[in-house]
Amino acid sequence: MAKVLYITAHPFNELVSNSMAAGKAFIETYQQQHPDDEVKHIDLFETYIPVIDKDVLTGWGKMSNGETLTDDEQMKVSRLSDILEEFLSADKYVFVTPMWNLSFPPVVKAYIDAISIAGKTFKYSAEGPQGLLTDKKVLHIQSRGGYYTEGPAANFEMGDRYLRTIMTFLGVPSYETIIIEGHNAEPHKTEEIKATSINNAEKLATTF
């Protein structure tokens, strides 16, 4: 039995968002095909994720020195630890994000910062940093209003490229994507684009 974290980063649901519609289709099909697997939904817009700020950095330093943390430091550090442990407990991750300003919503970066911890998800060595998530799988479902997979705007896309890069850095050997794009560039194709992405999601769910 595998544990899947279904991590969504969109303020709207599948009735409004193309990425959320594809994500819903994927996870429903996945659960049908893998009834014994555990799926946990994490809505990043409804989840408290402390940003790494002065309290967090100071708290980590105090922990290393065996010093007492303030209430705010303890609360933030403990919450980040809980997020990390939940992430480590899973076998597969499904990220669902829109493209915002060439990347993804800032809550995704906050989440990535929470789980990118030396000694837990990667380590330093004489040969350089080494990822520790060598038995995990990732799927990223991303919706883009324009066309960024190829063409003149391809080099501007920084969301999926960043997520792929950080997951590779953390040692993840399997990273797949479902890209939904072009519905703003060609509004008359919106329903076709959405239907294709849902079909792709349902197909991938059988083998992920």
Swiss-Prot record:
Task performed by this protein: Quinone reductase that provides resistance to thiol-specific stress caused by electrophilic quinones. Also exhibits azoreductase activity. Catalyzes the reductive cleavage of the azo bond in aromatic azo compounds to the corresponding amines.
Cofactor dependency: FMN
Species assigned in the record: Staphylococcus aureus (strain bovine RF122 / ET3-1)
Cofactor note: Binds 1 FMN per subunit.
Keyword rRNA-binding belongs to the record: no
Enzyme class, spelled out: oxidoreductase
Keyword Zinc carried by entry: no
The enzyme's E.C. designation: 1.6.5.-, 1.7.1.17
Keyword tags: Flavoprotein, FMN, NAD, Oxidoreductase
Gene transcribed to yield this protein: azoR
The organism's place on the tree of life at top rank: Bacteria
Residues the entry annotates as binding FMN: S17, N18, S19, M99, W100, N101, L102, S143, R144, G145, G146
Family stated for the protein in its record: Belongs to the azoreductase type 1 family.
UniProt cross-references to NCBIfam families, sorted A to Z: PRK13556.1 (NF010075)
MF annotations from Gene Ontology: electron transfer activity; FMN binding; oxidoreductase activity, acting on NAD(P)H as acceptor; oxidoreductase activity, acting on NAD(P)H, quinone or similar compound as acceptor
SUPFAM superfamilies, alphabetized: Flavoproteins
Protein name: FMN-dependent NADH:quinone oxidoreductase
Catalytic reaction annotation: 2 a quinone + NADH + H(+) = 2 a 1,4-benzosemiquinone + NAD(+); N,N-dimethyl-1,4-phenylenediamine + anthranilate + 2 NAD(+) = 2-(4-dimethylaminophenyl)diazenylbenzoate + 2 NADH + 2 H(+)
Source lineage: Bacteria, Bacillati, Bacillota, Bacilli, Bacillales
Oligomer status and interactors: Homodimer.
